[in-house]
From Swiss-Prot:
The gene is rps19. It is found in: Plastid, Chloroplast. Belongs to the universal ribosomal protein uS19 family. The keyword Ribosomal protein applies. NCBIfam families: rpsS_bact. Keywords: Chloroplast, Plastid, Ribonucleoprotein, Ribosomal protein, RNA-binding, rRNA-binding. Protein S19 forms a complex with S13 that binds strongly to the 16S ribosomal RNA. One of its GO terms (cellular component) is mitochondrial small ribosomal subunit. It comes from Pinus koraiensis. GO terms for biological process: ribosomal small subunit assembly; translation. This is Small ribosomal subunit protein uS19c. One of its GO terms (molecular function) is structural constituent of ribosome.
Length: 92
């Protein structure tokens, strides 16, 4: 179920504070965060945000098409290694 339109999108306060400070200084630094649930807002466009996937931080460059999506959508947590293959040689 979608979030109510009466409510504002969730963005972690520490992340929003860092974005605003970088926008004021007009700097582009990598911002490290564990907040996968934060929604991408227009103030984040052009910044690189390193999102934690459970093992490492994956750098994500935010574009205008990513607005209103969550940061966690762009940092996959599972690594698919393929299905187990049938090992017919070892059965003989």
């Amino acid at each position: 179920m979608a979030r109510s339109l009466k409510k504002n999108p969730f963005v972690a306060n520490h992340l929003l504070r860092k974005i605003k400070n970088l926008n004021i200084k007009k700097e582009k630094k990598i911002i490290v965060t564990w907040s996968r649930a934060s929604v991408i807002v227009p103030a984040m466009i052009g910044h690189t945000i390193a999102v934690h996937n459970g093992r490492e931080h994956l750098p994500i460059y935010v574009t205008d098409r990513m607005v209103d999506h969550k940061l966690g959508e762009f940092a996959p947590t599972l690594l698919f290694q393929g299905h187990a293959r049938n090992d017919k040689k070892s059965r003989r």
